[in-house]
C-alpha cells in the first residue's frame, strides 16, 4: 500500500511541474519521502521539473526606506492589480512602512502588534482593506543595518507600483561604497540570488546538488574517471546561480559581484529581496 496520499501527489506536482504518473513513480521510489522524490525527478530530468514552493498569485507592492544606516522593507498584498495601483492602497502601504521604520520592528508579529492611534496595526490594515473592498495583508518585513545600506525598488509594469524590492548592506561608508551598494542592489533585483556567500548555503542543500550532479552525470554516460571533475563543475555552477558574490555581475558579466565589491573596497554584509507574490 502506498505511503502517500492524493494530496501529497498534488503538492509535489505543484512543486515540480512533473506529470501525475511521474510524480507517483518518484514517490514510490522514494518510499513516500517528498524531498527525495524531488531529487529523483530532477535527476531523471522530467519535463517541467522546477520548484514552485511558495508560489502565489497575490497582487500588491513592495516599499522600502533607508534612514541612519537602517533599511526597512515591507510587502503588502491585495487581491487585484486594480487595488494595487489605487491611491488608498499605496497610502496604506506608506503608513505601514512609516510604522515599521518608527517602531523598530524587525519581524512581522511585532510590526502588526504595534499601536497605531490606540489599536494594533493589524486592525488598521483590516479596516482599510474593508474600505478598499479586498482582503489586504502585510506579508513580510525585512530590517537590515550596515555602514551603508541601499534600497532599490523596481517596477515590472509601468502601470503598477514597485513589485520588486531590495535592501543591500556593505561595510564601508565611502562614495565608492555607496555606488557599489546601489549597483549590486540593482543586480540582486534582476538576478535573484538566494545566499550572500557560499558559507550561507545549507550543507544539506549542497550535498543534494552534489548527488544530483553525480547521478545525472552517470545517467548521461560520463566516464567514471571524469565524474569528480564534472560534479565539482556543476556544483560550482550551482553556486554561481544561487550565491550573490559568485554571480556574474549584471552590468559587466566579465566580473563577479565579489570583484565589484572588492574594487570598491567593501564587503557585502546582508541583503533582502522581495518580489510580490513569490
UniProtKB/Swiss-Prot annotation:
Region (Involved in Mg(2+) ion dislocation from EF-Tu): 80-83
Keywords: Cytoplasm, Elongation factor, Protein biosynthesis
Cellular component, GO annotation: cytoplasm
Any one GO molecular function term: translation elongation factor activity
Gene field: tsf
Full protein name: Elongation factor Ts
Family per similarity comment: Belongs to the EF-Ts family.
CDD domains xref list: UBA_EF-Ts
Stored Pfam families: EF_TS
InterPro entries in alphabetical order: EF-Ts_dimer_sf, Transl_elong_EFTs/EF1B, Transl_elong_EFTs/EF1B_dimer, Transl_elong_Ts_CS, UBA-like_sf
Biological role: Associates with the EF-Tu.GDP complex and induces the exchange of GDP to GTP. It remains bound to the aminoacyl-tRNA.EF-Tu.GTP complex up to the GTP hydrolysis stage on the ribosome.
